[in-house]
Amino acid sequence: LNETGNQQRADNVTGLLGGSEFRAYLYSQKEPISAGFLMHISIDDFSGINSSCGYDYGDYVLKRVADCMKECISDQQRLYRLVGDQYIIVDLRSHSMEDAAQLEKKISKKIYEFIVSEQYKAVFTVSAGAIDARFALEGYEECRRKFDFSLRYAKAMGKNSFYSFQQEDYNAFLRKEKIISALRCSIAEQ
């Protein structure tokens, strides 16, 4: 809640709308989503920026990263801040995941230009995972699980990585989690 007692829509640091507004935007589509992508972006090792440069500079980085992304997206794309150092770009018109990959490269270049302009006070990269926007038709929670998985997969590939969702990878992840859960249950039952 903000100072007036209303639900806060925009983030105080970046000025971006948040996760609930992102969700509302997906549900507000009059036509079923038939194209596009959702790109989940996170600053790699953001906690290191806060630790070494302080929280005020960390907030400044969050704001400037958002500004860099805003400069890179088109009028048909939307940018939201989810939590912490995580953002999502929504594109409901693109017909290629290659468009998402190209956008991520453009954003990374713009962020590098920001780092140089700050005389390398903090050096960082971003990682991104993208999913087909049509996954939103499966419901918000399932869609969220898939774009969260995509970002985690990108980060597991190493810093400054981009990953385009593959169902086979997700199925393997779910199978592994199911096995781990079964092992935990069998240990707990002993």
Language-model features and meaning:
Residues 31, 74, 188:
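Short conserved AdoMet
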Residues 1-4, 8, 169:
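Heptad-repeat alpha-helical coiled-coil signal-transmission segments
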Residues 79, 106, 110, 120, ...:
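Cyclic nucleotide signaling catalytic output domains
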Residues 64-134, 184:
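GGDEF/GGEEF active-site signature
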Residues 44, 188-189:
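Short acidic/glycine-rich beta-turn/loop cap or linker motifs at sensory/regulatory domain boundaries
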